[in-house]
C-alpha cells in the first residue's frame, strides 16, 4: 500500500480524485518523467488503488474503490465531496463535452502545478479553514501572495450561497497577488463566450465571493488560457456591449504588446515572476536561452475611473492594463523592452532572490518607468527550488 510519505503517488491519487480520470501520458506529464510515471502507474495498479478502462480508443485510469477509501483514510474530510457518485467527475464519460472539459481541467492543473500554484485540496488554505462562511473580516484567509487554484466545485462547497452563472465556461478561480481570477481554458479550440453569462459571473464573483472569502472586496478579473498562436488566449470582452474582444497569441508576449500599442497609448504591464527551480537553471544557462514548457497566461482589460474635468464636468478615464505570469527570463526581457519603447509603465513582482537576475537580464538603464517589487512567499525549498 502506498504510504503518505510516497508524495508523488499520493499526489497522483489526489489529482485523479480532482479530475476524475487521466491517461498514462497525462500521469507521466504530471510527475514530469516518463519512466518514473510508468513505475507509479504500475505500483498503483498492483496495489489496486487505480483501475484502467477504455473509452473512445483511449486508455484511461480512474480511482478504484480501494483508492477512494485510501484517500479518505490518509486525508480525512478533504475528499468527501470529490468522491461522491453525484459529482460529474466521478461518472464515466460517454459525453464528448464532458471529456473535453476534463481534458481542459487536467491540462490547466498540470500547468499550474509546474508553476507552483497550489492545486491539490490538502495544500489549499481555504479548504483547511472551517470559518469561511462566518468570516466578516480579513482574518484567517489564504496568503495574499500565495497562488492557489480552486475548482468550481470547491468554490460551491466553500460558499453554499454563491451561485455561478449557468452559461459560464469558467473552470475555477485563481487567487494570487490580492486578486481573484476567473479562469478559462480554450485548449486548441475556440472558446464559446456568452457575454451576459460571463458578465454576471464576474459581478457575482466580485461582490459575493470576495467578501465571503476575504471579508472585503478584491479585484476580480477574467483569465483565459490557450495552447497555440492559432487559438484564443485573450479576454473575450472589451467592457462594451457587443464587442468580441481581441485575440493574441498565448506564447508571444512581445507581439501581443505591439498589437495593443496600435489601439492604446498608455498602459500598465504587470509581470509576476514565479517558478521553482528557477535559480539552478539560471546558474546553468546564464546568458543563454532559458526555456520552460509552461504556457504564458495573461489578461487585459480597461479600468474606468471618474474624474472632474477643467470645466467641472465629471468624465471617465480609461486605463489599459496587462497582467502576465512569465517563467522565461528571455521573454521577460523582450516584453519589458517592447513595453518601455511604447512608454508603458512596467511593474515586475518577484522573489527577493530573483531581483539581481532580473536586473542583469533587463539592464539597469532600461528605463525609469520600470519598477521591480519583491514579495515574500512561503517556499517549500531553498533558493534552488528543491
Question: What residue spans do the PLM features occupy?
Answer:
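Basic, Lys/Arg-rich alpha-helical nucleic-acid-recognition elements, primarily the DNA-binding modules
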Residues: 1-86
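Hydrophobic beta-strand residues in large extracellular and virion-surface proteins
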Residues: 41-44, 50, 61, 173, ...
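Short secondary-structure junctions
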Residues: 48-52, 117-122, 290-300
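Intrinsic-disorder/low-complexity loop/linker signature
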Residues: 57, 178, 311-312
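A short, polar/proline- and glycine-enriched secondary-structure boundary/capping micro-motif
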Residues: 70-75, 192-197, 334
Amino acid at each position: 500500500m502506498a504510504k503518505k510519505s510516497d508524495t508523488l503517488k499520493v499526489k497522483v491519487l489526489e489529482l485523479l480524485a480532482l479530475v476524475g480520470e487521466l491517461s498514462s501520458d497525462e500521469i507521466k506529464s504530471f510527475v514530469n518523467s516518463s519512466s518514473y510515471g510508468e513505475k507509479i502507474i504500475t505500483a498503483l495498479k498492483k496495489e489496486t488503488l487505480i483501475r484502467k478502462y477504455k473509452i473512445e480508443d483511449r486508455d484511461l485510469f480512474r480511482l478504484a474503490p480501494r483508492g477512494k477509501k485510501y484517500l479518505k483514510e490518509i486525508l480525512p474530510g478533504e475528499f468527501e465531496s470529490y468522491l461522491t457518485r453525484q459529482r460529474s467527475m466521478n461518472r464515466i464519460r460517454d459525453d464528448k463535452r464532458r471529456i473535453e472539459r476534463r481534458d481542459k481541467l487536467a491540462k490547466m492543473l498540470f500547468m499550474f502545478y509546474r508553476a507552483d500554484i497550489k492545486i491539490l485540496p490538502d495544500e489549499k488554505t481555504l479548504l483547511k479553514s472551517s470559518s469561511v462562511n462566518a468570516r466578516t473580516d480579513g482574518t484567517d484567509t489564504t496568503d495574499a501572495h500565495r497562488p492557489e487554484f480552486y475548482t468550481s466545485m470547491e468554490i460551491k462547497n466553500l460558499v453554499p450561497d454563491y451561485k455561478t452563472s449557468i452559461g459560464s465556461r469558467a473552470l475555477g478561480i485563481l487567487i494570487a497577488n490580492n486578486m481573484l481570477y476567473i479562469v478559462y481554458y480554450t485548449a486548441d479550440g475556440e472558446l464559446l463566450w456568452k457575454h451576459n453569462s460571463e458578465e454576471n459571473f464576474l459581478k457575482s464573483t466580485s461582490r459575493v465571493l470576495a467578501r465571503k472569502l476575504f471579508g472585503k472586496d478584491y479585484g476580480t478579473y477574467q483569465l483565459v488560457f490557450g495552447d497555440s498562436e492559432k487559438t484564443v488566449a485573450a479576454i473575450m470582452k472589451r467592457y462594451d456591449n457587443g464587442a468580441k474582444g481581441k485575440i493574441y497569441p498565448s506564447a508571444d508576449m512581445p507581439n501581443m504588446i505591439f498589437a495593443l500599442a496600435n489601439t492604446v497609448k498608455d498602459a500598465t504591464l504587470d509581470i509576476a515572476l514565479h517558478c521553482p527551480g528557477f535559480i539552478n537553471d539560471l546558474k546553468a544557462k546564464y546568458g543563454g536561452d532559458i526555456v520552460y514548457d509552461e504556457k504564458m497566461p495573461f489578461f487585459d482589460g480597461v479600468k474606468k475611473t471618474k474624474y472632474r474635468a477643467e470645466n467641472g464636468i465629471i468624465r471617465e478615464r480609461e486605463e489599459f492594463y496587462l497582467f502576465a505570469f512569465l517563467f522565461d527570463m528571455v521573454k521577460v526581457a523582450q516584453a519589458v523592452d517592447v513595453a518601455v519603447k511604447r512608454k508603458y509603465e512596467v511593474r515586475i513582482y518577484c522573489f527577493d532572490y530573483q531581483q539581481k537576475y532580473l536586473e542583469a537580464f533587463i539592464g539597469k538603464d532600461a528605463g525609469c518607468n520600470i519598477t521591480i517589487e519583491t514579495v515574500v512567499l512561503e517556499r517549500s525549498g531553498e533558493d534552488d527550488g528543491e
